[in-house]
Regions:
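A fold-level detector for beta-propeller and closely related beta-sheet-rich head/sensor domains
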Residues: 71-72, 148-149, 168
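Short, charge-rich binding segments
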Residues: 133-138, 144-146, 176-179
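N-terminal beta-propeller domains
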Residues: 1-116, 174-232
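Hydrophobic or amphipathic alpha-helical targeting/insertion segments
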Residues: 88, 140-163
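Tryptophan-centric aromatic hotspots in well-structured domains and transmembrane helices
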Residues: 61, 134, 154-155
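Asp-box/WD-like beta-propeller blade repeats and closely related beta-sheet repeat scaffolds
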Residues: 126-129, 158-179
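Beta-sandwich interaction modules
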Residues: 119-138
């Protein structure tokens, strides 16, 4: 005798496997169609062109015409994969070249002369320059990007033939950038202050000076640490 199994779609993760009796509890690379579990479609190569350096950030989205966009930031360049277009180099003019590897600041002249006694072991307090990373988000169909080595906020205005440009009036020496669902562009570690968060006016990515007529502003996190990332 065959018994028809009618397992509801979706994964149950809120309790134990015993509590999830009759439900799927774990899966990977699957989807549900008409209440049945099926594998997702196969992967496709977007481009066979390789990068010249290490990719350190990526963000994908759809533009207003439902075209796919994938922005990739590497150590020294910024690229876009646009639907129907091969890889395009949209690296901003004058961007500071980043680092593939972290670098230790222990070379000659890194410490003060005579700071430690001769023959005494030095403390392990070396300073490091971290690898370059990118934060990338989309403001509508445009992309906003920032590399840690460079610190500027760049905007790419959804044109594969044009490079990204500096976002007008935005702070510099930032640690990262993100966009909220309410369409505020936010800078992390804004202006070189490692604990400052600064945001633009709503729906106006180039308005950063607070006024009674806009919603731009900033705050400083009450901590002695440094902002490294954010999520909205």
């Amino acid at each position: 005798m065959l018994i028809k199994l009618e397992i509801p779609p979706g994964l149950y993760k809120n309790g134990t496997e015993y509590q999830a009796a009759g439900r799927w509890t774990d899966a990977n690379l699957v989807r549900w169609f008409e209440n049945t579990l099926r594998p997702i479609g196969g992967w496709q190569t977007m481009s066979s062109t390789q990068f010249n350096d290490v990719a350190r950030g990526m963000h994908g989205y759809f533009d207003n015409s439902n075209n796919r966009r994938v922005i990739v930031g590497t150590t020294s360049n910024l690229y876009v994969y646009a639907e129907g277009v091969s890889q395009s180099n949209i690296t901003p003019s004058g961007i500071v070249t980043g680092r593939n590897d972290a670098a230790s600041q222990i070379g000659y002249g890194a410490q003060l002369y005579g700071e430690h006694a001769y023959g005494v072991a030095r403390p392990d307090n070396e300073q490091y320059d971290p690898v370059t990373t990118w934060t990338i988000d989309n403001f509508g169909e445009d992309a906003v990007c920032s590399a840690t080595t460079d610190g500027k906020i760049y905007i790419w205005e959804n044109n594969p033939s044009a490079v990204a440009t500096v976002l007008t009036n935005a702070p510099t020496s930032n640690q990262g950038v993100l966009v909220t669902d309410e369409r505020f562009v936010m800078c992390l570690g804004a202006g070189g202050n490692p604990r400052k968060v600064q945001w633009s006016d709503q729906e106006a990515a180039t308005v950063w000076t607070p006024a009674s007529t806009n919603a731009a502003g900033s705050l400083e996190v009450a901590s002695d640490g440094k902002i490294r990332a954010g999520i909205v």
